[in-house]
């Protein structure tokens, strides 16, 4: 049994689920969902209502699981306490291996999501369960989170450059580890791209698809923060988004 922790907010989790279900023969798949997710067994997998903060529900989700795929998207939320609960229950239920979707970046990065993922990697190592960690760079599919939908990019990235990757390429690289075709060797792998893009480059690319020129303006970080707060985004989420912007710049 394979347990995927998130397919709703996680593009990687969703893409991996689709790849698993596309195979003629695959291990049974279970997915953690909330009571509000409209998913059923008819979708080809077993949805289980569970929360990182409800230990009995974690026990049910992990029952009979061999492979735990931690795919939860932590850009907006600190998941560390929930991950600790998950790891504790995974050890108790005899999970055989863990696949963790982490984030790429330097060890001294100011990005809060990346710092938290590094801490979680350490806890996974200490769990004693064989693991593979995949440090994924920013997904090109997540660009709207950073640049919005207007015909102008106003983001405090300066001249920073990013190795954007496609979620489909990432999922295909991870799939053999999830299915067991490749063994896990208690290693961390970085999934990135050989070409970097600045936000100026992105604006130039987008300009090819619009009638007018798409402009990039590197706004002040304080202005960006105030703008997000005016949108009624919770302050702790704003702090996370600002830390990512600062890391890119």
Tell what function each PLM region has.
Residues 235-246:
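Short, well-structured alpha-helical segments
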Residues 249:
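C-terminal helical cap and adjacent loop that interface with cofactors, partners, or active-site loops
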């Amino acid at each position: 049994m394979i347990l995927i922790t998130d397919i709703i907010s996680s593009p990687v989790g969703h893409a991996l689920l689709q790849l698993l279900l596309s195979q003629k023969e695959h291990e049974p798949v279970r997915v953690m969902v909330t009571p509000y997710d409209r998913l059923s067994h008819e979708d080809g997998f077993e949805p289980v209502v569970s929360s990182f903060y409800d230990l009995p529900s974690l026990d049910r989700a992990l029952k009979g699981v061999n492979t735990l795929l931690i795919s939860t998207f932590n850009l907006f939320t600190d998941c560390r306490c929930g991950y600790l609960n998950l790891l504790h229950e995974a050890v108790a239920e005899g999970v055989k291996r863990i696949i963790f979707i982490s984030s790429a970046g330097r060890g001294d990065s100011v990005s809060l999501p990346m710092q938290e993922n590094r801490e979680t990697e350490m806890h996974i190592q200490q769990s004693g369960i064989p693991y593979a960690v995949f440090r994924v760079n920013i997904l090109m599919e997540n660009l709207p989170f950073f640049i919005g939908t207007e015909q102008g990019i106003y983001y405090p990235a300066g001249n920073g450059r990013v190795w954007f990757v496609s979620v489909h390429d990432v999922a295909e690289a991870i799939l053999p580890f999830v299915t067991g075709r490749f063994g896990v060797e208690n290693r961390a792998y970085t999934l990135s791209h050989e070409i970097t893009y600045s936000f100026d480059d992105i604006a130039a690319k987008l300009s090819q698809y619009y009638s007018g020129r798409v402009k990039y303006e590197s706004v002040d970080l304080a202005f960006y923060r105030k703008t997000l707060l005016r949108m009624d985004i919770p302050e702790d989420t704003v702090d996370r988004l600002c830390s990512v912007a600062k890391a890119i710049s």
